[in-house]
């Protein structure tokens, strides 16, 4: 309890972006949308001190493309934390075309100081993890569409057969089906590989406003507290 209270005492929530001017390192974690991130980084670039590193928690948007919206591409980097962040030890650090080695080293050390295990990747569509993860989830959705298995059996198969802590469908609900769809589109646009194309069922669910846990409905149904509701 004492450790928790000490940690909370160091947090200073604010709705003012100007507060970032006092930061030594900035990590952006807004919605997965390039235009929104680009506008935010343009503002942060003018607010933060010149030596401050700007990092994005993006899981799919090119780092070099976002860095171009700032005057510090050498101090711009990808720093993706995985859901659920409190229990997932991995941080994927992605180097843009102009990211300096000093920026990479600082970000690696910061990740370690947070108790995370960092890996580094180059700035290519999907980086490392989503290059593997997106086709996996897409295949699970195709299996559901084709009636090969129920959503429960597909998720149980991944958990017990592949030793995954969450099944692909429940994890997609957790991440957000709209987010997964956006990542599919980014990867398909960048790589033109059909395995990254969004399954029709995924697109249909998103168009219906079923985004997963945050909307109360995705592949499963959820209560306001995020707990799953059993189908009647």
Residue ranges and their predicted role:
Residues 11, 26-29, 55, 83, ...:
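Buried hydrophobic positions in well-ordered alpha/beta secondary-structure cores of metabolic enzymes
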Residues 9-10, 50-51, 73-76, 152-153:
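Short acidic capping loops at alpha-helix termini that bridge into adjacent secondary structure
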Residues 1-54, 61-62:
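Rossmann-like NAD(P)-binding element
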Residues 102-105, 112-123, 142-146, 151-232:
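NAD(P)-dependent Rossmann-like dehydrogenase/reductase catalytic/cofactor-binding core
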Residues 131, 135-139, 160:
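Short, residue-level hotspots on alpha-helical faces of the histone-fold
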Residues 23, 37, 86-90, 136-137:
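N-terminal alpha-helical segment
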Residues 13-15, 77-78, 120, 221:
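Structural signal for conserved beta-strand scaffold positions within catalytic alpha/beta enzyme cores
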Residues 2, 53-123, 127-131:
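Rossmann-fold dinucleotide-binding core
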